[in-house]
Amino acid sequence: MRPYQRTGVAWLLHLFRNELGGILADEMGLGKTLQALAFLSSLKKEKDSALPSLVVCPASLIENWRRETIRFCPEFQVLVHHGSTRTSVPTSLTGYDLIITSYGTLIRDKEIFENLPLLCVIGDEAQYLKNRKTQNAQAISALTSEGRILLT
């Protein structure tokens, strides 16, 4: 990791430890996904938690998140909750370190996620959440988690 990425991870950990949310914003291609994954990996070790974290992103980025997670956090058990093969049983979402879904799937499967305790929620492409009256913003706000981070 580059020094500015390490600083970003340290800042995300500081926010989480102080029960604050935050927005990690920079230019495209500077490693926000890597920083978020390093943050989640550090958090998982620090908290020794069995709770999964959730990444909510545009459908076009799901595969990128899955690939980057396998590359940078091979120890993570990852579930992509998207498409026609996704589960409708909330208990089948337990046992994972990271669940990746899209904003549209989160809205459609709101009942599944509303009662699922999460370690951290990461909303990628935060412009999808600018208006708090939208279904995207309401669905992500309804989630129960110990921390929340947005990326943009």
Please provide the spans of the model-predicted regions.
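ASCE P-loop NTPase motor core, strongest for the SF2 helicase catalytic module
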Residues: 1-152
